């Protein structure tokens, strides 16, 4: 099964840029989170349908996004579906389509009542795999 790439375009705001005139490092996490939420909505439904918590997030910054950029593009791929976790690989692109950052994150399915992780259900797994690489553990 091939990977499905979910793409979202996000508008930048004046406050997203720092005093050095580039997109602030912390804002990347916000953009990546919005893009992951979009990918999950398109596979398993909204957050209420698939409560989750982020247990890992890493970003490698490759290229500056300078003040004046009106939007960025975030591409998200579901790289792996585990027993209770989903691994995402994401890239943030400059307005010119160059890779500005690469990210990997792991989300864990969450049971709000028990306040703990839970096993990903069969229907959820099928939906995630349909939007992902097909790699299961």
Task: Give each language-model segment a name.
Residues 1-73, 79-137:
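Terminal targeting signals and extreme-terminal segments of soluble enzymes
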């Amino acid at each position: 099964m091939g990977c499905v790439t979910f793409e979202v375009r996000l508008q930048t705001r004046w406050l997203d840029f720092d005093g050095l005139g580039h997109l602030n490092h912390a804002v990347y996490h916000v953009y990546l989170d919005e893009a992951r939420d979009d990918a999950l909505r398109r596979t398993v439904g909204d957050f209420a349908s698939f409560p989750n918590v982020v247990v890992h997030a890493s970003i490698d910054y490759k290229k500056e996004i300078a003040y004046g950029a009106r939007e960025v593009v975030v591409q998200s791929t579901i790289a792996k579906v585990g027993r209770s976790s989903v691994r995402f690989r994401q890239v943030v692109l400059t307005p010119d389509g160059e890779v500005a950052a690469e990210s990997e994150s792991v989300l864990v399915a969450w049971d709000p009542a028990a306040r703990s992780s839970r096993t990903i259900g069969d229907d959820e797994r099928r939906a995630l795999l349909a939007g992902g690489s097909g790699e299961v553990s």
